[in-house]
Amino acid sequence: MLWHYRIFQKANQYRELDGMGTTIVVAVVIESELLIANVGDSRAYLYRNYQIKQLTEDHTLVQELLKSGEISEEEAKSHPQRNIVTQSLGITLNVQIDFVRVSLKDGDTIFLCSDGLSNMVEDQYIKEILGNYSDVTTQANKAVEAANEAGGRDNITVAIAKYTAREEVEE
């Protein structure tokens, strides 16, 4: 929470930084457990057995409208307020951090990205990239390339990690 407080403090200290904030998604692997924390609309996905699953939930107005049933998935894709973030670091003193815990299996791929990618590239296409290329550098480059080709209207950040289960060592 220190980073959140520092962003909040700087934004309040300097007038030109008023309204400054950021989203974040963090992934930590401890043994075979994946722990994720997120605020805002940066996302974490798990790719396993040729399937992709979004692990985080966006903190956005459109996500709230989807959850309440006021709009459909199709309407959400082009909603004029789809970029309104309801939670972010640095905007208000109180922030809601969501936590997710997942058991990993050998061969799983962890895919983190900013909204600059997830707003431009469909989950299905992310799945295809992860399935068609085995090297994480190539996967990341292809994902960024796809977002840029789709219009690249925002910063695009991607982090990819492959999980390999440790073999038990007998003593």
Regions found by a protein language model. Give the residues of each.
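PP2C/PPM-type serine/threonine phosphatase catalytic domain
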Residues: 1-171
